[in-house]
């Protein structure tokens, strides 16, 4: 048996060698295989390296080469994100190294540095200056400059580096760094990172790494190996990285997280939001701020599992993403207070009024320690007290302040003192100025168009509504997340009283309102609060008076997210255009034009004509013709079709009485 098996094996091997020899004999070395060349291989079957065109991009102090094909992700829209991150990490390094007696030097900053910005003044140059502290005689200050290794500096990780642009910018623009780990799971991306590191001469600071970001962070859980700064900017949701991130960041370290899955966080898929972030998102006008608070809740919830908690420094909603900067601390006593920092949201589906219900209750005791217990609720009745509609339940979400205004002021002051440092400095100043004006203890907001559309009245101006709230002794502010937001500590009843008073100046035709509509029920109640719409000087915020760039319009076409990076992918612009072409005319029902809509509406009888109240006559978009009587099958004659009936055929309309 063994001999026969060996003989069969040798026979098959000889047959393969013979067939291969015949193939190469037929494929003459002098004649290249044109079919193989067309398929992307060499003339004799070997694989040829695919020619990839590369593009060089200069952003900040970095110069990056990346392939034009969509193999490595790069989005120029995120320049504001990267500029803001550099500014935040710089101030964080100033705080951390300042405690060690190390001063950082930022190119463009003067010896006298601004430390306080007086936002109450209209002149943007009116800033308080503070001289640097005098050192003791004979002492030499320790300094840290950009591009140099600081042995006591920050250990930074960029978990999803792609082309390495962000990490290289950290090395070239942020002082006080010990090392920067630029990690990515893609081999193509890591090769590009190595090339860009050599191109910018930052190999002494930036360390390329190829690994799964989660496993890399899990391997740095030890206190001595943790990172001082972790930056996560994934394509889509960062939910799968948060558990590892809260364990790998050092005590008091900085965690920078970007979420670009705004469709999920804004309430389009509440069940998906719950599976990723542990909270139900609601469709509301305040969805962008609620998205920020859901991300903060998710971070704090994951940190609590390891006796850690988060302290938000800055939370931004911009363009198509949200970005949060938090510090992570350890403390069992502080973790107990986390439940009282979260809240559920009861939102009326009719008028949009919302109420918050805290998950926990913290009360003080004579000994000085806080006592925690379950909260009592709910804060609403089954039906809305304003319009009688039902409530939707969302959350939990972070209900505490989402910004550290002192830290925001430091970043704003540094950017204002050195406007040439970033390309988007003007926008950073505008957004941070609005943030400093926000009410820190008031979650969520209403919008002008929401309030007016609910009762079908004209929209008051921003200054008129803000003045009415200020005259009623309520606080009011804008929100960086929405340009027509009204963030106020006034209850919903006071807001609707103000809108009732406004409606009296611009009356609504009550006969057009349904008795069950929110507008009818709200306007049927007389206001208890008499609103005063006289414009007040303090109703116009300082950032608006100074004309800062607070809410940037899209500067170019296709301003938004880019396609995901794919191996061997097409150029980003080409891929987007092909996607648009493939999706054209793929709707279930093509949009109808004006004539088609008018013809369709004419098939419906006019209800007001039946009641005798329609005054439009022939101009009415609905039909005034009497309904055609239906002919039952029993009453139909048995005679054949007459000559005046239309014979059936293509495009023939159905006769009277036929459904």
Curated annotation (Swiss-Prot):
Transit peptide: 1-23
Effect of residue 233 to A: Abolished tRNA guanine-dimethyltransferase activity
Residue list for modification Phosphothreonine: 628, 646
Binding positions (S-adenosyl-L-methionine): 82, 166, 184
Positions of post-translational Phosphoserine modification: 120, 517, 625
Pfam families: TRM, zf-CCCH
UniProt-annotated site: (Microbial infection) Cleavage, residues: 530-531
Top-level enzyme category: transferase
Residue numbers binding Zn(2+): 348, 351, 384, 387
Entry PTM: (Microbial infection) Cleaved between Gln-530 and Ala-531 by the 3C-like proteinase nsp5 from human coronavirus SARS-CoV-2, leading to its inactivation.
Effect on the protein of changing residue 531 to S: Does not affect cleavage by coronavirus SARS-CoV-2 proteinase nsp5
Entry EC no(s): 2.1.1.216
Annotated catalysed reactions: guanosine(26) in tRNA + 2 S-adenosyl-L-methionine = N(2)-dimethylguanosine(26) in tRNA + 2 S-adenosyl-L-homocysteine + 2 H(+)
Zinc finger (C3H1-type): 600-627
Effect of residue 530 to N/A/K: Abolished cleavage by coronavirus SARS-CoV-2 proteinase nsp5
Region: Disordered, residue numbers: 537-578, 616-659
Similarity-based family: Belongs to the class I-like SAM-binding methyltransferase superfamily. Trm1 family.
Purpose of the protein: Dimethylates a single guanine residue at position 26 of most nuclear- and mitochondrial-encoded tRNAs using S-adenosyl-L-methionine as donor of the methyl groups. tRNA guanine(26)-dimethylation is required for redox homeostasis and ensure proper cellular proliferation and oxidative stress survival.
Protein name: tRNA (guanine(26)-N(2))-dimethyltransferase
Source species: Homo sapiens (Human)
The gene coding this protein: TRMT1
């Amino acid at each position: 048996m063994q001999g026969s098996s060996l003989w069969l094996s040798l026979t098959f091997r000889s047959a393969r060698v013979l067939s291969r020899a015949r193939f190469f004999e037929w494929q003459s070395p002098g004649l290249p295989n044109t079919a193989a060349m067309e398929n992307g291989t060499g003339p004799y079957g070997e694989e040829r390296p695919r020619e990839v065109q590369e593009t060089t991009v200069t952003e900040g102090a970095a110069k990056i080469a990346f392939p034009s094909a969509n193999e490595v992700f790069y989005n120029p829209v995120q320049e504001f994100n990267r500029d803001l991150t550099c500014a935040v990490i710089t101030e964080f390094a100033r705080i951390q190294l300042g405690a060690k007696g190390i001063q950082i030097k930022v190119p463009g900053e003067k010896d006298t540095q601004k430390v306080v910005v007086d936002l109450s003044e209209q002149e943007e140059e009116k800033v308080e200056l503070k001289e640097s502290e005098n050192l003791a005689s004979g002492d030499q200050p320790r300094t840290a400059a950009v591009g140099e290794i600081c042995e006591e500096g920050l250990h930074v990780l960029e978990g999803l580096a792609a082309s390495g642009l962000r990490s290289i910018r950290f090395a070239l623009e942020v002082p006080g760094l010990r090392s920067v780990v630029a990690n990515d799971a893609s081999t193509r991306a890591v090769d590009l990172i190595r090339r860009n590191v050599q191109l910018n001469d930052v190999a002494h600071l930036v360390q390329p790494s190829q690994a799964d970001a989660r496993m890399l962070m899990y391997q740095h859980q030890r206190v001595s190996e943790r990172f001082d700064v972790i930056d996560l900017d994934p394509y889509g949701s960062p939910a799968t990285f948060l558990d590892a991130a809260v364990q790998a960041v050092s005590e008091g370290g900085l965690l920078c997280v970007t979420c670009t899955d705004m469709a999920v966080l804004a309430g389009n898929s509440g069940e998906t939001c719950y599976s990723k972030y542990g909270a139900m998102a609601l469709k509301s006008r305040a969805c962008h701020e609620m998205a920020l608070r859901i991300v903060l809740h998710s971070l704090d919830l994951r940190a609590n599992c390891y006796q850690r908690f988060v302290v938000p420094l800055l939370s931004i909603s911009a363009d198509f993403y949200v970005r949060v900067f938090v510090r992570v601390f350890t403390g069992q006593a502080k973790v107990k207070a986390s439940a009282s920092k979260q809240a559920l949201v009861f939102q009326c589906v009719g008028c949009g009024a919302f109420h918050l219900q805290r998950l926990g209750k913290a009360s003080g005791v004579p000994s000085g320690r806080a006592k925690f217990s379950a909260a009592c609720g709910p804060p609403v009745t089954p039906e809305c007290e304003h319009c009688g509609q039902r409530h939707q339940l969302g959350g939990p979400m972070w209900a505490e302040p989402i910004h550290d205004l002192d830290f925001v002021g430091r970043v704003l002051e540094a950017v204002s003192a050195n406007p040439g440092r970033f390309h988007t400095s003007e926008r950073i100043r505008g957004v941070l100025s609005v943030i400093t004006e926000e009410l820190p203890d008031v979650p969520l907001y209403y919008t002008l168009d929401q309030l007016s559309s609910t009762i079908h009245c004209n929209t008051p101006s921003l200054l008129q509504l803000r003045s009415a709230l200020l005259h009623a002794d309520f606080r009011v502010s804008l929100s960086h997340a929405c340009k027509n937001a009204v963030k106020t500590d006034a209850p919903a009843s006071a807001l609707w009283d103000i809108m009732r008073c406004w409606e009296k100046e611009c009356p609504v035709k009550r006969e057009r309102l349904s008795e069950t509509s929110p507008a009818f029920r709200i306007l049927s109640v007389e206001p208890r609060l008499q609103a005063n719409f006289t414009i007040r000087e303090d109703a116009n915020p300082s950032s608006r008076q100074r004309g800062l760039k607070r809410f940037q319009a899209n500067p170019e076409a296709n301003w938004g997210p880019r396609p995901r990076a794919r191996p061997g992918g097409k150029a980003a612009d080409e891929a987007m255009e092909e996607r648009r072409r493939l999706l054209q005319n793929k709707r279930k029902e093509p949009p109808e034009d004006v004539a088609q809509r008018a013809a369709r509406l004419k098939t419906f009888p006019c209800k007001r004509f039946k009641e005798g109240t329609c005054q439009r006559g022939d101009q009415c978009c609905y039909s005034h013709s009497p309904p055609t009587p239906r002919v039952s099958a029993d009453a139909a004659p048995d005679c054949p079709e007459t000559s005046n009936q239309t014979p059936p055929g293509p495009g023939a309309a159905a006769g009277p009485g036929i459904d």
